[in-house]
Regions:
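PLD/PLD-like phosphodiesterase catalytic module centered on the HKD motif
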Residues: 1-243
Length: 243
């Protein structure tokens, strides 16, 4: 059943049959933008592929069967485009994910540690997550600690900085900065809430830039954003309304 309202949905065969029963005055359609077609169709197909893989699983197929279907799709793309490079994009039969990689000269290797020992957030760095403060969820500050030590660069935009909050992650920030990581922070003196001690502690860190706005008349910043850049491409961002 189609509900009245706004859409931005690719018209597939099923939807087309429903639309055929609706008078022209009640519907509005438009061609897919040629410049955006690849993105629009890829997003649509992501849904279709996921449903297909879930169907394989629901019918008793293991991950091997799902990989087989995924590779059939890759093969179809390769055959259609005649680009041999697509052959390298087939999923390996071992059904594994790369989780971490260390440099060849990483000092941790000399201490007996391996890539498996690296701290990583409990939440996915590839999928979106929502923090609600529920008991079964990881605590926000513990996730930030793991994000910090696994990042290459960090940007923070916060309306104010309290020492009571900063002290929970200052050790990780210090370790990050001393290891060559670049830290950039923008904050304000909003409502006089920023603690001088917090700013002084951050100023003492190497590779750190801090910008503080003292314009209390025009600045009404109440956004909180933390961006953890990773050279691997798996950058994560936290956006919310609380420090």
């Amino acid at each position: 059943m189609l509900y009245p309202g706004l859409y931005e949905q690719v018209i597939n065969n099923a939807l087309n049959r429903e639309l055929a029963e609706i008078p022209e005055a009640r519907k509005s359609t438009a061609p897919i933008d040629t410049a955006e077609a690849a993105k629009v169709l890829a997003q649509y197909l992501a849904d279709v592929v996921q449903k297909g893989l879930e169907n394989v699983q629901d019918n008793g197929g293991g991950i091997e069967a799902q990989i087989q279907l995924a590779n059939q799709i890759v093969t179809t793309i390769q055959n259609t485009t005649q680009e041999a490079d697509f052959a390298a994009l087939g999923v390996d039969g071992r059904a594994e994910q790369l989780l971490a990689l260390l440099q060849q000269n990483d000092p941790r290797l000399a201490t007996g540690k391996s890539a498996k020992d690296l701290d990583r957030p409990e939440t996915s760095i590839a999928q979106s997550s929502l923090f609600t403060g529920a008991i079964h969820e990881p605590q926000m500050y513990t996730e930030l600690k793991k994000e910090i030590v696994s990042a290459d660069r960090i940007d923070m935009l916060v309306s104010f900085i309290k020492w009571s909050g900063l002290r929970l992650i200052i050790d990780e920030l210090r370790q990050f900065a001393q290891s060559g990581g670049e830290l950039r922070i923008i904050t304000t003196s909003y409502m006089g809430a920023t603690d001088v001690k917090a700013i002084e502690e951050l100023r003492a860190l190497p590779n750190t830039k801090i910008k503080v706005s003292y314009d209390t008349k025009r600045t009404r910043l109440h956004a909180k954003t933390y961006v953890f850049y990773r050279d691997t491409g798996f950058t994560t961002a936290y956006v919310g309304s609380s420090n």
